[in-house]
Amino acid sequence: WYLRMLRDSPAAAERLCHILSSSRYITDLLEDAPTSITWLDKVADLQPLSAGALKAEITSLLSRHEDSADAMRAVRYLRRREILRIAMGDALNLLSVQQVCTGLATVDERTIGAALALAEREEVKAGERDEETAPQKSDAPQSDSQDAAGESSEDEQQNPLLTEITVIAMGRLGGAENGFGSDADVMFVHRPVEGADEKEAQAQANRIVNRLMQLIKQPVRPAIRAERPLEVDADLRPEGKQGALVRSLDSYRAYY
């Protein structure tokens, strides 16, 4: 099929020859994604996807994969695909420096966002399992205070997430100045939901963020050929490596 496309599109054939002779990195990526050659026929296909388009595609991927490892592999493959798209456009001088940097930053932001969504989804499922295995309520009459406590407990069970987590982009990622080898400098902040126990919220935030980091860097099966895994660096946080990986909003406010 691609030979027909190259025969019918001299521009695509010329672009392919240019890429293969100028970039070993792109050549390695193309070997595992030959359908990407079709992008060479249209300049529009060599433009970085918008943040909205990436979000929609990633949301669809997550909904189709119940297993977090499988879902994250799909997201990481998408990231590699989009890096290839940007690299091809860059090699052919079809993109400005700003387009390249912003495109790469957007892909990494969405990848981190996907890992956060998966980690939170796991936490919700764990909470639902705990609720299912919890002892059933007694049918004995309860006082007003017990009723109120029961309602509060039921509300907490309906929403297993005790805190809201945000990832703050720093460095090159924060300034949308990414290169092809850039890592992602970030800080993690959380805000307990109203009525949540602060210690429990902090413990949950720690679990979610540690799982996020694991999903991004752990080996996937089958391995993604020529993947350069995203390196997430949270060392710019208060107290560096010795400090808490994720802090509450109030903690950041007090620190600064």
Model-flagged regions — what are they?
Residues W1-Y256:
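Non-catalytic regulatory/linker segments of enzymes
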